[in-house]
A protein has these predicted regions:
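Transmembrane-helix motifs of polytopic, lipid-linked glycan transferases
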Residues: 86-107, 138, 142
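Transmembrane-helix signature of polytopic, membrane-embedded enzymes
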Residues: 99-122, 150-157, 230
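Hydrophobic/aromatic-rich transmembrane helices and adjacent perimembrane loops
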Residues: 174, 300, 306-346, 362-368
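Membrane-interface alpha helices of multi-pass inner-membrane proteins
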Residues: 120-122, 155-170, 176-181, 208-209, ...
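Extracytoplasmic catalytic/substrate-binding loops of multi-pass membrane glycan-assembly enzymes
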Residues: 30-44, 55-70, 79, 222, ...
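Membrane-interface transmembrane helices that cradle and orient dolichyl/undecaprenyl
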Residues: 139-157, 190-191, 269-287, 327-333
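Extracytoplasmic
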Residues: 62, 171-174, 221, 346-534
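Loop-to-helix entry region of an early transmembrane alpha helix in multi-pass inner-membrane enzymes
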Residues: 64, 68, 78-97, 259-262
């Protein structure tokens, strides 16, 4: 009890330290900028600054809060990558602080909280994976608080956290919503079991009321049925493209990282087995309320998150695992029977898990990326250098792909020969192009080729593009056939109306074609490129 009280007394300083250290670490690792996948959110956030909203004005696969936060960051900081860098770094920092809080609430141990948080930071999820760390840490903290003191206020807090997770990505809300219901049903109370249905009803009602405004918005601008259908179509295409992976461990090129897949599944199963072993313990219902919801969420999240390629997807499943590891270690430290064997087995398992985490997260490579080894005595200079790079529009190390780097002369041409009202049709996975070009995307699609197809979606895109001014279309050669087959109506529109303006060679296999609308009358010719001007 004294240890638990001391942990609660010291948790705020440790949470602040976790926030500061993690935020600084993630910020300094942005030496090579954001991966192009992250620009799905940066570009969409930039689009929102013009008053164009997801679902109403452009396709949203179910991530409204990620888009809104990117927009808010750019509105506050400016339309530069620094805005997203601060958002993402602080989100990971907040996730670390909340993990400390969740584990202290769950175990009463500050040491285990620090260990769990260190593993979470070490596995290093991709920048766009910050919600998978942040919302799970926040909701697990709410779960643990409710188990420790089941009050109506904490029921509502759980509902708020779950709805926040839903708005980040809808499946997060589903997984964590189920976990919240299990937490309420399993938390021991003074009365009969049926009395737990009352807080469950409050939880469901609060969540429903909180999410109703968003559902009403979706119904108003497109309809819930159409939204759900489009989301399912998108999810199915993503699942077909990025399937769940069960890698070989022995003989694998990276056995420690591959082993982490099985460790992520083993941890919740072992936690449930340990729970069964405690079935005669007077604390069993309390343990069940702590473990079963997190284990259930872990298994659902594992199956959903752990997809190909593992190098980018595997770290996303870290939070349920480290929370359960902390709980298991606490049970091991409390063991009386077979204590030496339990501690030895637990130590070996922890070492294996830690080694897998460090390997999967490339911890030492990421530390090297911060340049702290080389300039450990000048941290402020390092921060200044990184900030300067993130404020530049075309800092070379901040450009995510060779194709986009090759388009910089085109972006500079757009500054000279187009207006902010002009849009770009992006026919391939170059989702970062509108952001660097400082031009909005057209047709309500950040890009074609990996987004929503189908005849209904294409007709909506055509209606939108006919109401917009779209002088240019950018078509990378590796997506040309996909546009022709999947977006045949868009392809027909482009062939009838656009002509080739120039080609940008990227590699022997990749060429980016820039098409121009042949029906638009130019005001003159650009002196540097001789391309048509439309200002």
């Amino acid at each position: 009890m004294n240890q638990s009280r001391a942990a609660h007394d010291w948790r705020w300083p440790v949470m602040i330290a976790a926030f500061v250290i993690t935020t600084g670490f993630r910020y300094l690792t942005l030496a090579d900028g954001f991966p192009n996948d992250h620009f799905v959110y940066i570009t969409a956030g930039w689009q929102m600054l013009f008053g164009e909203w997801p679902t109403r004005d452009w396709v949203d696969p179910g991530l409204p809060l990620m888009f809104a936060l990117s927009a808010l960051a750019q509105a506050v900081v400016g339309e530069v990558l620094l805005a997203e860098a601060l958002l993402v770094s602080m989100a990971f920092g907040l996730a670390a602080a909340l993990t400390v809080a969740a584990v202290v609430e769950l175990t009463g141990s500050l040491g285990l909280a620090v260990l769990a948080t260190a593993l979470e930071v070490a596995v290093f999820p991709r920048t766009y994976g910050y919600p998978k760390v942040l919302v799970y840490a926040a909701v697990f903290w709410c779960f643990a608080r409710y188990v420790n003191q089941p009050t109506p206020r904490r029921v509502v807090a759980m509902a708020i956290a779950v709805v926040g997770a839903f708005l980040f990505r809808h499946d997060h809300g589903l997984f964590l919503g189920i976990g919240g219901a299990l937490t309420i049903l399993l938390t021991p109370g003074d009365g009969p079991w049926r009395h737990r249905l009352r807080p469950l009803a409050v939880y469901v009602a609060a969540g429903t009321l909180l999410v109703l405004p968003y559902l009403a918005y979706v119904q108003l601008y497109g309809g819930i049925a159409s939204y759900v259908s489009a989301g399912i179509d998108f999810s199915q295409r993503e699942a077909a493209r990025q399937w769940h992976v069960w890698p070989a461990v022995f003989g694998d090129a990276d056995p420690l990282a591959s082993a982490l897949v099985y460790e992520f599944y083993a941890i919740p199963l072992v936690a449930l087995l340990v729970l069964v072993a405690f079935r005669r313990d007077s604390r069993w219902w309390r343990f069940a309320a702590q473990v079963v919801p997190v284990a259930a969420v872990a298994l659902m999240a594992n199956y959903n998150f752990i997809r190909d390629p593992l190098v980018t997807r595997l770290p996303d499943a870290i939070v349920p695992a480290v929370v359960l590891v902390a709980w298991l270690l606490m049970r091991g430290l409390e063991a009386r029977r077979y204590r030496p064997a339990i501690l030895a087995a637990g130590t070996l398992a922890l070492l294996l898990f830690s080694a897998s985490v460090v390997r999967a997260g490339d911890l030492f490579g990421n530390i090297d990326r911060t340049s702290l080894w080389a300039e450990w005595d000048h941290p402020l200079r390092l921060l200044g250098t990184r900030t300067s790079e993130l404020q530049q529009r075309f800092a070379r190390r901040q450009i995510p792909t060779r194709a986009t780097a090759g388009l910089i002369p085109f972006f500079e041409y757009l500054d000279r020969c187009s207006t902010p009202d002009h849009r770009l049709l992006v026919g391939g996975y170059l989702v970062e192009v509108p952001f660097f070009a400082r031009r909005r995307f057209a047709a309500g699609q950040p890009y074609f080729g990996g987004s929503f197809g189908g005849e209904e979606g294409q007709r909506l895109a055509l209606r939108r593009i006919r109401e917009e001014i779209v002088p240019f279309a950018i078509i990378p050669s590796d997506y040309a056939s996909a546009i022709e087959s999947r977006f045949y109506l868009i392809d027909q529109y482009l062939r009838a109306r656009y002509m080739l303006m120039t080609e940008v060679p990227v590699s022997d296999e990749l060429v980016v074609s820039i098409l121009v609308d042949s029906t638009m009358v130019p005001s003159g010719r650009d002196r540097e490129t001789s391309w048509p001007c439309f200002r």
